């Protein structure tokens, strides 16, 4: 079994219960899913770029991503409807905990000048979103084989009702916050 899943079941649930005194065990917040999105604006000019982004995201997540398409045409960006402009992957259950573990233990310590996350990254409903500027912080990415450095947005969706509950939950997984 995964370490972060065991950590949640054995320690974090107990700490959340003590802190917020829930009446029902189903009220205790948990992580529902993690969504990783990689927008590839260069794909407008060169369609091969999207394949490289898909390969990178597949290596990082361990799951094949879905290619996202433009919803409408925008002339100033030379964008047409249904053009490939990015890719995203939704992780649930064991893959979600596996990714979170690799993110906290391996990837975040490799980010340059990283002090922690801001409280402002919460959306008011308990979900947490942040961005990484480089995909090379993940050990699965071979630096010599990438064509360009790409960033990504990572959203952690929780069942928490408030940002305070969500922050307490994510702090239990050792996600660093500086506020």
Curated annotation (Swiss-Prot):
Pfam families: Ribosomal_L5, Ribosomal_L5_C. One of its GO terms (molecular function) is structural constituent of ribosome. It comes from the Bacteria. The keyword Disulfide bond does not apply. Keywords: Ribonucleoprotein, Ribosomal protein, RNA-binding, rRNA-binding, tRNA-binding. GO terms for cellular component: ribonucleoprotein complex; ribosome. This is one of the proteins that bind and probably mediate the attachment of the 5S RNA into the large ribosomal subunit, where it forms part of the central protuberance. In the 70S ribosome it contacts protein S13 of the 30S subunit (bridge B1b), connecting the 2 subunits; this bridge is implicated in subunit movement. Contacts the P site tRNA; the 5S rRNA and some of its associated proteins might help stabilize positioning of ribosome-bound tRNAs. HAMAP family: Ribosomal_uL5_B (MF_01333_B). Belongs to the universal ribosomal protein uL5 family. NCBIfam families: PRK00010.1 (NF000585). This is Large ribosomal subunit protein uL5. It comes from Rickettsia akari (strain Hartford). The lineage of its organism: Bacteria, Pseudomonadati, Pseudomonadota, Alphaproteobacteria, Rickettsiales.
